[in-house]
């Protein structure tokens, strides 16, 4: 399955540049501390087939699952939060114009990640990286 292109900044991003910045400072800090390239490498060829509808990039979806876990959100709540919160969109890698995954897509990605045994190792690796830099992220809490 081919991947969708997300994160290309457009006119709407210029209009919303300041929106959600204050609430997104923690997420921006987290984003700067994590080795996303290494995590993307661990995800490997997540969509081996090039047939069917394009899927969201695996790293983007992993970031969605991280936000969901940290904020204790259900799949429908995560979908709504991505629609509503610019800080979440920016952290995950979506521009203001990008379509975001619906709750079923989030669920399917999580199931595929679990089936490959990658869910716990990837979440633990993110937690380890943040903890090694003085941040402790738990459900609903950030401690530095």
Question: Which stretches of residues belong to each language-model region?
Answer:
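Charged, often Cys/His-bearing segments associated with DNA-binding zinc-finger transcription factors
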Residues: 1-37
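Alpha-helical support elements that line or immediately flank enzyme active sites
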Residues: 60-72
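Short, conserved catalytic/metal-binding motifs centered on acidic residues
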Residues: 25, 43, 64, 78-82, ...
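Short, Lys/Arg-enriched N-terminal segment that forms or immediately precedes the first helix
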Residues: 40-53
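Short, basic interhelical loop/turn and adjoining N-cap
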Residues: 86-96
């Amino acid at each position: 399955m081919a991947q969708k292109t997300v994160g290309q900044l457009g006119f709407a991003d210029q209009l919303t540049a300041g929106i959600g910045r204050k609430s997104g400072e923690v997420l921006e800090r987290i984003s700067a501390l994590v080795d996303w390239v290494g995590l993307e490498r661990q995800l490997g060829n997540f969509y081996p087939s090039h047939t069917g509808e394009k899927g969201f990039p695996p790293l983007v979806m992993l970031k969605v699952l991280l936000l969901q876990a940290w904020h204790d959100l259900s799949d429908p709540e995560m979908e709504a939060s991505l629609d509503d919160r610019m800080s979440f969109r920016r952290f995950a890698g979506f521009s203001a114009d990008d379509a975001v995954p619906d709750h079923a897509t989030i669920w399917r990605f999580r199931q595929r990640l679990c089936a490959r045994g990658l869910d716990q190792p990837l979440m633990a690796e993110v937690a380890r990286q943040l903890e090694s830099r003085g941040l402790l992220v738990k459900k609903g809490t950030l401690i530095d």
